[in-house]
């Protein structure tokens, strides 16, 4: 069909862009559409290879490919991006990359309709091809192209196919280019997708119902973190973006649902580092009539199952070390870990006045940190780096766990809460959920006092949530898992932005605030 009139070229284009546009004009002059509306793609590159497997190297077994073989009765219609192009007089070879793989193409003046216009194909162009497979003299399975169609002209050259994008920040800023040219980039995000699908399937099979809570909230609770603010024009009201999924899921337990979960984005107005991004994905679930022991078993099943799903084994490599997700996971008592690993800590760490003096003397850089947060500071400094394989950190102090139930055996000191750490950072956080409305109000009021004293990360008092608790919330276990950090581990990624398709980045030329190392520690409630 005739091409629609194209807009005039802008002024000031780069000479490479002009050359590519000239090639597009030449293809149009040869009778091709510049921007077709669709293309009848019937297969992917992997389908051709699956139909004609090669022999296993060194064994002579598996496939039957021999140089010169051809299957003219077979027809494949593929589409993808051209990543290599070699013209040889009356023939040309190209590499076509699609979502799942790459295949070599062969064009010939004798057999390929529109052969002359292939000389106007630029690296990065997306084309459609039809043809049959054959084996070259060197034994490479190749598609002999009989028909082809330019689908879109790439106006910019691709980075080197050998090196990809080397600059880490540029990879994140130009993710669309990174996905094109960096080896393994797409596979990371495909693994992340499989990971989330596995979690959903597991929870659905266990009777959990997926729900969606509000992103805009009057009171952003469920964690200790600074929220982002936004103004609603029609209501003339300042709302907050959610920092957790917790409190609305608990309202659903009050309403009668017994097993609920949500996988969604949360937002915390905090710094950025290798394990923190202000916008990140959480799984939170709540299970009526369960406690944190039931949740611990569920966590072991989910995490070990995910390792098997992604790697086919409980053991896999992360940053040069072998991690072992074989259940059961190791366990460490929170206060016991502090006493064992913090040098000079020979007193009860719950004596916050002594802890303040102890830290002021040894860690003067923490003098502005609220006393109760020094517990997590010390744990993060001395204990977390020791937790290589997945480890349950059990029974956190009540002063840092405002939404957890007091421990049934040690109610005066600690709560029924655990976190899972692996390779030095937190993956999961879980509680036996507090459902005593008066106890919860007392803890909220303590947090409100901290907020009045200047702690802008103290948990706000949510009166509607307290009212819901007064109607009666069943005993329950709750869990939060940081999906992005889990994806880091399972894809051997050093930074959280390597597993976020579009991570938050500072404006070019600006500076990012470093993350407080207590930020986002409360990944669930």
Curated annotation (Swiss-Prot):
EC number(s): the record gives: 6.1.1.6
* Gene Ontology terms: cellular component: cytoplasm; cytosol
EC main group? ligase
- Tell me the residue numbers annotated for binding Mg(2+) 2: 426
Q: Which reaction does this enzyme catalyse, per its entry? A: tRNA(Lys) + L-lysine + ATP = L-lysyl-tRNA(Lys) + AMP + diphosphate
Q: Which residues bind Mg(2+) 1?
A: 419, 426
Please give one Pfam family short name.
tRNA_anti-codon
List the source organism: Deinococcus radiodurans (strain ATCC 13939 / DSM 20539 / JCM 16871 / CCUG 27074 / LMG 4051 / NBRC 15346 / NCIMB 9279 / VKM B-1422 / R1)
Query: Where is it predominantly found?
Result: cytoplasm
Protein name, as recorded:
Lysine--tRNA ligase
Write down the HAMAP family for this protein, in alphabetical order.
Lys_tRNA_synth_class2
- What does the record give as cofactor? Mg(2+)
Q: How are cofactors bound according to the entry's free-text note?
A: Binds 3 Mg(2+) ions per subunit.
PROSITE patterns to which the protein is assigned, alphabetical: AA_TRNA_LIGASE_II
Q: Which UniProt keywords apply?
A: Aminoacyl-tRNA synthetase, ATP-binding, Cytoplasm, Ligase, Magnesium, Metal-binding, Nucleotide-binding, Protein biosynthesis
Report the locations given in the UniProt record: Cytoplasm
Which family, according to UniProt? Belongs to the class-II aminoacyl-tRNA synthetase family.
Q: Assembly state and interactors?
A: Homodimer.
One GO term in the molecular function aspect is: lysine-tRNA ligase activity
A GO BP term here is: lysyl-tRNA aminoacylation
């Amino acid at each position: 069909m005739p091409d629609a009139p194209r807009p005039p070229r802008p002024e000031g284009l780069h000479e490479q862009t002009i050359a590519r546009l000239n090639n597009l004009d030449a293809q149009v002059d040869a009778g091709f559409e510049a921007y077709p509306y669709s293309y009848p793609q019937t297969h992917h590159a992997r389908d051709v290879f699956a139909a004609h497997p090669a022999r296993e190297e060194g064994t002579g077994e598996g496939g039957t490919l021999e140089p010169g073989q051809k299957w003219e009765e077979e027809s494949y219609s593929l589409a993808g991006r051209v990543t290599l192009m070699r013209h040889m007089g009356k023939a040309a070879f190209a590499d076509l990359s699609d979502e799942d793989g790459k295949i070599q193409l062969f064009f010939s003046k004798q057999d390929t309709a529109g052969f002359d216009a292939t000389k106007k194909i630029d690296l990065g162009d997306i084309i459609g091809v039809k043809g049959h497979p054959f084996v070259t003299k060197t034994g490479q399975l190749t598609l002999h192209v009989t028909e082809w169609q330019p689908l879109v002209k790439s106006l910019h050259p691709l980075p080197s196919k050998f090196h990809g994008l080397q600059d880490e920040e540029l990879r994140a800023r130009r993710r669309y280019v990174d996905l094109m040219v960096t080896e393994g980039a797409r596979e990371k995000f495909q693994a992340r997708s499989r990971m989330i699908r596995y979690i959903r399937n597991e929870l659905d099979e266990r009777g959990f119902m997926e729900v969606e809570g509000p992103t805009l909230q009057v009171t952003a609770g469920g964690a200790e973190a600074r929220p982002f603010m936004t103004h609603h024009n029609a209501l003339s009201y300042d709302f907050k973006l959610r920092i957790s999924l917790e409190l609305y899921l608990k309202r659903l337990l009050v309403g009668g649902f017994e097993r609920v979960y949500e996988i969604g984005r949360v937002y915390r107005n905090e710094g950025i580092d290798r394990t923190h991004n202000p916008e990140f994905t959480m799984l939170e679930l709540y299970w009526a009539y369960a406690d944190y022991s039931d949740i611990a078993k569920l966590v072991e099943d989910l995490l070990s199952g995910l390792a098997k799903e992604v790697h086919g084994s409980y053991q896999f490599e992360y940053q040069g070390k072998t991690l072992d997700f074989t259940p059961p996971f190791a366990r460490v008592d929170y206060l016991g870990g502090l006493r064992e690993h913090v040098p000079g800590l020979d007193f009860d760490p719950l004596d916050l006045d002594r802890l303040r003096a102890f830290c002021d003397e040894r860690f003067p850089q923490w003098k502005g940190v609220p006393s109760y947060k020094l517990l997590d500071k010390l744990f993060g400094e001395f204990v977390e780096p020791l937790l290589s394989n997945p480890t349950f950190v059990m029974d956190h102090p009540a002063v840092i766990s405002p939404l957890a139930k007091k421990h049934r055996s040690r109610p005066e000191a600690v709560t029924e809460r655990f976190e899972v750490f692996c390779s030095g950072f937190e993956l999961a956080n879980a509680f036996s959920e507090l459902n005593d409305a008066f106890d919860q109000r007392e803890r909220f009021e303590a947090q409100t006092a901290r907020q009045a004293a200047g702690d802008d990360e103290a948990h706000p008092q949510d009166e509607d949530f307290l009212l819901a608790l007064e109607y009666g919330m069943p005993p329950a276990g709750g869990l939060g898992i940081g999906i992005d950090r889990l994806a880091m581990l399972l894809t051997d990624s050093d930074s959280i932005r390597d597993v976020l398709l579009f991570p938050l980045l500072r404006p070019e030329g600006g500076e990012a605030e470093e993350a407080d190392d207590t930020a986002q520690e409360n990944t669930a409630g």
